[in-house]
Amino acid sequence: MNVLVLNAGSSSLKFQIIATDLERIQRDSDERLCHGYVERIGGEAIITVEPRGGPRKKVTAPVRNIAAALDYVLRWLASDQSGVAEIRSLSDVHAVGHRVVHGGEVFRESAVITDEVLQGIEDCIDLAPLHNPNNIKGILAARDAFGSGMPQVAVFDTAFHTSLPDHAYLYAMPYHLYARHRIRRYGFHGTSNRYVAYRYRTLRQLTREQTNIITLHLGNGCSATAIRNGRSMDTSMGMTPLEGLVMGTRSGDLDPAILSLIATKEGLSPTEVEALLNTQCGLLGISGVTNDMKVLLQELREHDDRRIRLAIEIFCYRARKYIGALLACMGGADAVIFTGGIGENAPEIRARICAGLEWAGLEIDSDQNAQTMGRPQQISKPESRLQAWVIPTDEELLIARDTVRCILGEPHPA
């Protein structure tokens, strides 16, 4: 089964074609046929496409919306220039899987998209106003392109965290605010966490119930999650992805009183304050330079700028602080797993975060940490009671697999 995996954003569309079926899932032999993305949708877009084993192609073209971006991708896939031998027409795409950010309390697992499911996603727009509307546009664009008979599946970022106990997801606010408006912790990066937990237990030959880890998904968005017996028991992101760790442009944890103070002092509306916390804070806000950790590390090596150094220190300190808190909540863990763009590619950041965790039994192997590149790798010393691993995430693979299972009515694996 050739599954088109889509991740629709406000001005971008990421896609992959993954060949998979129940037998391939069992053998862990899924095939990625191509991948790519469309950026700067709404103007002169940049379209990058790369078939399996083929050269990367980058072009620019006017793309006005998500539907036009998908149309461009599908025309490329069906053309002789794509290099994807398995796709010669739209009929060679058998299903579409979508990343959907917020499923609220309704969607506890992935779901075949029906009108009722689509309405449920729309009902969660208040919880994810920046994300769910774009996810819906991707679903509707695929329905228009393929017709209503094409099976589509929604895979929710929040679903993995529906196992949180109420003492972990409720805020210490008047209970009626939760009852009326469902104001609570939902957590995000769930598909990434689920994949990393699956890959870790596969590498270690563990059952789900034997999987006790802390994951650090570190990219432009960052989160820490405690996974006990294979299930999420607490996570740093909250009702929105703004809470928790320091991120590329998001503040993470703040004293709530700061919001009204900023509004008063700077003359900003609540919406403008929220936008500031989402787009002008984090690494960018502290450094005053960029939200890109790779650039910050390079700048620090060349100039030793105080604000850049401070941004990196605060980022690592907050992550280490969350590891300690989650270890206490779990009563200990077997491993800390790094994933995401920074987690997978910045050994210096991993080393900084783990420094000082010797009390918990974690000691980094400097050589292993430096060598890790694009593959799962233990980076702690063999004698460490608390291991550290790098495991590259693959959310698209899980979306494709969930799509197959949902369409065939197969239960999700433990």
From Swiss-Prot:
The keyword DNA repair does not apply. It is an enzyme of class 2 (transferase). GO terms for molecular function: acetate kinase activity; ATP binding; magnesium ion binding. Its EC number is 2.7.2.1. This is Acetate kinase. Homodimer. Pathway: Metabolic intermediate biosynthesis; acetyl-CoA biosynthesis; acetyl-CoA from acetate: step 1/2. It is found in: Cytoplasm. It catalyses: acetate + ATP = acetyl phosphate + ADP. The lineage of its organism: Bacteria, Pseudomonadati, Acidobacteriota, Terriglobia, Bryobacterales. Mg(2+). Can also accept Mn(2+). PROSITE patterns: ACETATE_KINASE_1, ACETATE_KINASE_2. Mg(2+) binds at residues 7, 395. It comes from Solibacter usitatus (strain Ellin6076).
